Amino acid sequence: MQKLVHYRGNLAHGAVLRFPGSYPHEKYVDLMLVEFPDSDRKFGFVVSTGHKAGLILVKLPKEAEAVGSAGIDRQWLIDNWNAWIYESAKVGDVYVAQHYPVPVRAEL
């Protein structure tokens, strides 16, 4: 994972953001960028950790979409972090990964 503010390129579905959380979330929160193909708001974030896992946090506005690629514009995300994504976390504390790693083996 690397800091979002240093990440190069835009974000595609499956990208994971990790940052310090606050109530009602846990100490750290992961969000996954998801695509809603049958919606006028094509991209959004789903909480992927803790008690809120599986819940849609936000559907992003059309202006968040990247031009020329399927995903969202990294600079739009940085500029609009506190207004659209998470008010109490600093964008400088947000880390990004292209996706979760595939486990080497599964333990059930």
Which functions belong to the PLM regions below?
Residues 7-9, 31-35, 42-45, 73, ...:
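Hydrophobic alpha-helical membrane-spanning segments
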Residues 1-12:
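Mixed-charge, Lys/Arg-rich low-complexity intrinsically disordered regions
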Residues 26-62:
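Basic/aromatic-rich interaction segments and small domains that mediate binding to polyanionic partners
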